[in-house]
From Swiss-Prot:
Protein name: Large ribosomal subunit protein uL14
Assembly and binders: Part of the 50S ribosomal subunit. Forms a cluster with proteins L3 and L19. In the 70S ribosome, L14 and L19 interact and together make contacts with the 16S rRNA in bridges B5 and B8.
Domain of life, per lineage: Bacteria
Keywords carried by this UniProt record: Ribonucleoprotein, Ribosomal protein, RNA-binding, rRNA-binding
Length: 122
């Protein structure tokens, strides 16, 4: 459950370390975002001399949340942190690697490139 002012870790090698959510992009006037939702965020921490700099406004997709995710089978999944992957306007990741596990629900929301880069899909 991600809302405005939420800090997220960055799960790729685009150069950013931490993001702060500015707006959840979803259908309707939704306050919270979950796994697979796109957000507009600002970079709060970044690695020097990389593609993304501090205070850049970027688009990202949420890949992990601490809020439990309930599946249709009755199983719930909860991750250790809130994390996102920075994407471009077409929805492709800016980085070339994705760190940590991602949820299977990303495949249903047409983020197959992120799923294929991830080391583990849960």
């Amino acid at each position: 459950m991600i809302q405005q002012q939420t800090y997220l870790n960055v799960a790729d090698n685009s150069g950013a370390r931490k993001l702060m959510c500015l707006r959840v992009l979803s259908t309707g006037n939704c306050r919270y975002g979950g796994i697979g939702d796109q957000i507009i965020a600002v970079v709060k921490e970044a690695i020097p001399n990389m593609g993304v700099k501090k205070s850049d406004v970027v688009r990202a997709v949420i890949v992990r949340t601490r809020q439990p995710l309930r599946r249709a089978s009755g199983m719930s999944i909860r991750f250790d942190d809130n994390a996102a992957v920075i994407i471009n306007a077409e929805g492709n990741p800016k980085g070339t690697r994705v760190f940590g596990p991602v949820a299977r629900e990303l495949r249903d929301k047409n983020f197959t490139k992120i799923v294929s880069l991830a080391p583990e899909v849960i």
